[in-house]
Design a protein with these regions (language model features):
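Sec/Tat signal peptide C-region and signal peptidase I cleavage site
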Residues: 23-27
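C-terminal membrane-anchoring or membrane-association module
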Residues: 213-227
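A short, hydrophobic C-terminal helix/tail in secreted or cell-surface proteins
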Residues: 197-216
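Extracellular carbohydrate recognition
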Residues: 182-187
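Acidic, Ser/Thr/Pro-rich low-complexity intrinsically disordered segments
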Residues: 60-158, 167-171, 177-181, 192-194
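Bacterial N-terminal signal peptides
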Residues: 13-21, 209
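Bacterial N-terminal signal peptides that target proteins for export
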Residues: 2-12, 199
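Predominantly extracellular/luminal regions of secreted and cell-surface proteins
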Residues: 28-52
Length: 227
């Protein structure tokens, strides 16, 4: 009975370890071309739950009226228990305007004035030639860049309430904005991973269990040979 119990636990732990080590899944969790416009209401953002691996959101924003028609996309991301969001990458940007704006707040809705720095936990301009308030007068491309560490840097995003990456389990409301009346296409990729401690413990448990199982079988084999 004890041997069977060890076997089951070992195999289960090894399977979990293999899953954690496998290549991360990739999924487009929202594409405005397929699912329609993301919410324009900060009090009721489009609610999305992130899954382990890469989660992509694709959309467009097009400036404030009267010349523009769709300046803001509001979306809330929920990170499940036991996981963290390790990156927020501006993977694509297509616009005649060199930059847009993105920022987030803790919670399932955005409270306060989105035009005040103190309403955000972190923010950044993004685009092919983005200017950010970090003391650097030279604009730079954020395409392919993980924005989370920059958004958490008070010299890069001054006046915010602050946060420490990675983002822990919970819900966060993000704004993606283009203030000028030009159509701006974007893609953001959120990478979600298991909390490192949990993964390490399961892997160690699996390897330890398999080692015990192998030893028991080896001893049993030697015992039969001796008899």
């Amino acid at each position: 009975m004890h041997s069977a119990s060890v076997t089951k636990k070992s195999l289960f732990s090894a399977a979990v370890c293999a899953l954690l080590a496998a290549a991360p899944a990739k999924a487009i969790i929202f594409d405005e071309a397929v699912s329609g416009d993301l919410s324009n209401n900060k009090a009721a953002p489009t609610a999305l739950t992130l899954t382990p691996g890469l989660n992509s959101v694709i959309g467009t924003v097009a400036g404030f009226p009267p010349e523009g028609t769709d300046p803001q996309d509001w979306v809330s991301f929920t990170i499940p228990a036991g996981f963290v969001m390790i990156s927020y990458v501006n993977s694509k940007y297509d616009s005649t305007d060199p930059q847009g704006f993105t920022g987030f707040q803790f919670g399932s809705a955005f409270l306060g004035d989105e035009f005040i720095e103190g309403s955000y936990a972190g923010y950044a301009h993004f685009g092919t030639a983005a200017n950010n308030p970090d003391g650097n007068p030279v604009s730079s491309s954020t395409v392919g860049v993980n924005l989370l560490p920059l958004m958490a840097d008070p010299s890069f995003a001054p006046g915010t309430t602050g946060f420490t990456p990675p983002l822990a389990a919970g819900t966060y409301t993000f704004l993606i904005q283009q203030g000028n009346p030009v159509t701006t296409g974007y893609q953001f990729d959120m990478n979600v991973r298991a909390v490192p401690e949990s993964g390490s413990s399961l892997c160690l448990l699996g390897m330890g269990g398999l080692a015990i199982l192998a030893l028991r079988r080896r001893l049993g084999y030697l015992d039969r040979r001796i008899r």
